[in-house]
């Protein structure tokens, strides 16, 4: 029924303690609640599944009443001190990965810091690559912002005709580095 589909979609969005090994998790993207709590009230289904001892959310004291005489529809007012102490605080964990492919003709990708004087097409400027180490990987625990490069990689041209089209005198490479999405920022957890 549509109601079952709706409920399963809502359950997938719920936060809590999904795995005790979150740093070793293989999920590409995942949300984590920072201060999950064991539920105060449980159901028979939770007891049968053995979930009564697992932190699955946060216990909040809720009052349903008009706020200062105004009937605000679809609004929630939180206590500022509760939010300051971590109520509802979560973090988002995203995995970035890249692989070095081998192409016909013996050409292959290289993990490196792209250089402006190495005839690299699509070079993004030294500021973007400032956090990379010599092997092309970012330094552990670096603070990154949108546009920063996480994995430095160069690739051969896609088609050999590109040599003739752009009248390149020597072999050039393309910058295919992996970067942080423009709207995101964060800290590198592990490499």
Describe each region flagged by the PLM.
Residues 1-191:
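Conduit-forming functional cores of very large proteins
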């Amino acid at each position: 029924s549509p109601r079952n589909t709706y409920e399963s979609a809502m359950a997938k969005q719920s936060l809590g303690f999904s795995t005790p090994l979150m740093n070793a998790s293989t999920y590409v993207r995942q949300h984590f609640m920072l201060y999950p709590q064991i539920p105060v009230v449980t159901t028979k289904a939770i007891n049968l599944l053995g979930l009564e001892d697992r932190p699955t959310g946060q216990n909040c004291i809720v009052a349903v009443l008009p706020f200062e005489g105004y009937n605000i529809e679809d609004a929630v007012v939180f206590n500022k001190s509760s939010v300051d102490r971590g109520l509802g605080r979560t973090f988002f964990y995203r995995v970035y990965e890249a692989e070095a492919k081998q192409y016909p003709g013996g050409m292959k990708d290289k993990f490196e810091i792209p250089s402006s004087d190495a005839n690299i097409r699509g070079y993004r400027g030294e500021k973007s690559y400032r956090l990379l180490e010599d092997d092309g990987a970012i330094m552990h625990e670096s603070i990154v912002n949108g546009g920063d490069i996480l994995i430095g990689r160069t690739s051969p041209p896609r088609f050999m005709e590109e040599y003739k089209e752009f009248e390149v005198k020597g072999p050039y490479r393309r910058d295919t580095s992996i970067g942080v999405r423009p709207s995101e920022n964060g800290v590198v957890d592990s490499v």
